[in-house]
Amino acid sequence: PEMSRGLGDVYKRQEWYDSAEGLDDLALDYRIKSVQSAILKYKRYYPDHQARKVFDDLLGFRSLCDNYEEVLQLKKIDKFRIADMTNGKANDDGYRGIHVYFQLDGKHYPIEIQYNTYYDRQFNNWLHKYVYKKEYDNSVGCYLRKRYESAKILSEKEFKEELDHVLFDSETYR
């Protein structure tokens, strides 16, 4: 019930966002977490975490930045919580970025804004398309990230070829 109510609230916000004037001019993309993703996340974390903590990213925005230094300055503002993944997550999977969470108060859902440099966004998009939510070990994403950072992967085609090569050559990654 709590999850259904939360998703309903988020879809109302999506309708508002889609109809609001002037927002098209902002350099933001948004997404609403799919019901499937929300259920998977709920099952993974509940009951160990409160539902509102599990769903802190139902409504998310994505924005690009030239570098992460200005975004990190948001730490100084009271209502912002920063998740700095510029050097990887605690359980690194190759993703890089900064997630900023804003919540007006406990009665409102938080809003997540994901910031990436152009360089990281390109790689993160490929990770999301070909690796994310698959049963691959996180070391697959880390290996691909190293290849990307050493300029061995310069295109989506090369990303896919490297991924296929890694998966074909090693049972470890399956």
Q: Model-flagged regions — what are they?
A:
Residues 166-174:
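Subset of Sec-pathway N-terminal targeting signals
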